[in-house]
Design a protein with these regions (language model features):
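Polytopic transmembrane helical bundles with strong interfacial aromatic enrichment
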Residues: 1-484
């Protein structure tokens, strides 16, 4: 195992662990805020107790999510120092704003939310709850701005003297369409996760014939939030597909296992089952739109790599002669400027490196969609059965609700695996390959931290699950007032 593999493994491990907690924080924050709003509007003490119960679980998850997120950010400086130097001027800005604005906002209002029930007015407490939920979404915005920039770099210019990309347009970075789409899709999927968590836990209460009125009320609210999240996720997913087809065509080709481009590209449901023209429509909103295939992009990649080699050689010549021979340096700089759009391709040795792991992208994409559709169906049925008052009657459905909880997590994990693996070999699309972003560290030191982080994160996950299960199992609200 080399340093590159181990560094990627470490980052993938910590990112996947972190994303176990983030979507639940995003979704549960909205659900508990809606519940407290109902309490304030109706004055029903039952809703107050319901909101406080879900806030307790939110707090447990929030604490572990913060711990894993801090470790994740430090990895940019430890294992990926070349990356940090190359794009730190751009990438660091949204992360700094996230830490200064969103995190402090969350830290302030979460304290009022937990400890202010008997100390501030109902409306002040409600505002603190909503601001806590809003803070988590602001935090997600700036993190996703940074990630969107890695997928579609804009608003910067490369300085050959400092060997850094420098931000030229903050608003282009912060509000580019790719960031808006990614934020909407990711946060909406978080709403689905939080809502499914509430539905699943409530289904368990109904299965055990405990806290039944609380469970029924919770399922109604959560299923509505989940359906809103589902619709937003579908809308953003459609926009995301068009954006990928335009800016990351190799990722789309890998997701579909499409080797040869076509004007009538079919959508593959599973190998051997295809819907004619559907991929062309999804990618271009035209039934006969052209979709690039892997082999087509490899042919284009030959020219891009050749251009990149010219840019890389000119850059090295400029750096070598800029202090000793101005004419050679200026000539090299002119050559570099002419070819710099392909500078990152100069680090690649063959077109095979341009192709990500096609089977992994293909199946992760299908698992994401399949599990997402199952969860959406669960929300529809939960809302219908809940409205009719039939929830305790259908025990098979309660079991389905509980089984859909791991499904929503599988969908989220597979979505991010597809997003990041499909971008390979790039750390920053078209600018910096992953292999050029590494720090000068030994394989042994990286392996040690992989083992340490895996142990620590597993311990944190086990601790959270045990604490949550204990809180759920011990919760009693048998005197809940039924309010019509």
């Amino acid at each position: 195992m080399d340093v590159l593999f181990l560094s990627r493994l470490q980052f993938a491990l910590t990112a996947c662990y972190h994303w176990l907690f983030v979507p639940l924080t995003l979704g549960l924050g909205v659900v508990m805020s809606v519940m407290e709003t109902i309490y304030v509007v109706k004055g029903d003490e039952a809703w107050r107790r319901i909101a406080r119960f879900w806030q307790k679980l939110f707090g447990i998850n929030f604490a572990v999510g913060v711990a894993t997120g801090i470790i994740l950010e430090f990895e940019f400086g430890t294992n990926w120092s070349n990356y940090s130097w190359f794009v730190g001027d751009i990438f660091g800005a949204p992360l700094a704003i996230e830490g200064i604005l969103a995190f402090f906002m969350e830290a302030t209002f979460i304290a009022i939310m937990f400890f202010g029930w008997e100390k501030v007015s109902k409306r002040t407490h409600l505002a603190a709850t909503w601001l806590t939920a809003l803070g988590t979404m602001i935090s997600a915005w700036w993190i996703l701005v940074a990630n969107a920039w890695m997928q579609h770099p804009v608003g910067m210019d490369f300085n050959p003297d400092t060997v850094r990309n420098e931000m030229m347009d903050f608003f282009a970075v912060a509000f580019q369409p790719a960031a808006v789409i990614k934020f909407t899709h990711s946060v909406a999927s978080g709403w689905m996760t939080g809502a499914m968590f509430v539905v699943a836990v409530s289904a368990w209460f109904l299965w055990k014939k405990r806290n039944e009125e609380m469970a029924k009320k919770s399922i109604l609210v959560a299923s509505i939030v989940g359906l809103v999240g589902t619709l937003l996720c579908m809308f953003a997913g459609d926009k995301h597909g068009v954006d990928i087809a335009k800016n990351q065509p190799m990722k789309l080709a890998a997701a579909e296992g499409l080797m040869q481009g076509s004007n009538e590209a079919p959508f593959s449901i599973v190998p051997g089952i295809e819907v004619p023209h559907m991929l062309s429509f999804l990618a271009t909103h035209d039934w006969n739109g052209y979709v690039w295939g892997v082999e087509d992009l490899k042919q284009v990649g030959e020219e891009q790599i050749a251009e990149g080699k010219v840019a890389l050689e000119a850059f090295r010549t400029y750096r070598e002669h800029r202090d000793t021979n101005d004419s050679i340096a200026q000539q090299a700089l002119a050559t570099f400027q002419q070819h710099k759009a392909y500078f990152g391709y100069g680090y690649l040795d063959s077109t095979e490196e341009l192709v990500p792991n096609v089977p992994l992208c293909y199946w992760c994409f299908r698992l994401m969609i399949g599990c997402g559709c199952l969860v959406a169906l669960c929300f529809v049925l939960a809302l219908f059965f809940g409205y009719k008052g039939w929830l305790p009657r259908y025990r098979w459905f309660l079991l389905l609700c509980m089984l859909c909880l791991p499904a929503v997590y599988v969908a989220g994990q597979c979505g991010w695996i597809f997003t990041e693996v499909g971008r390979q070999p790039w750390a920053i699309q078209g600018l910096l390959p992953v292999k050029a972003a590494l720090s000068s560290v030994s394989a042994g030191s990286v392996l040690t931290t992989v083992i340490l982080f895996a142990t620590l994160f597993t311990a944190l996950l086990i601790a959270e699950v045990r604490i949550m299960l204990k809180a759920i199992q011990q919760h009693k609200d048998e005197d809940l007032v039924v309010s019509d």
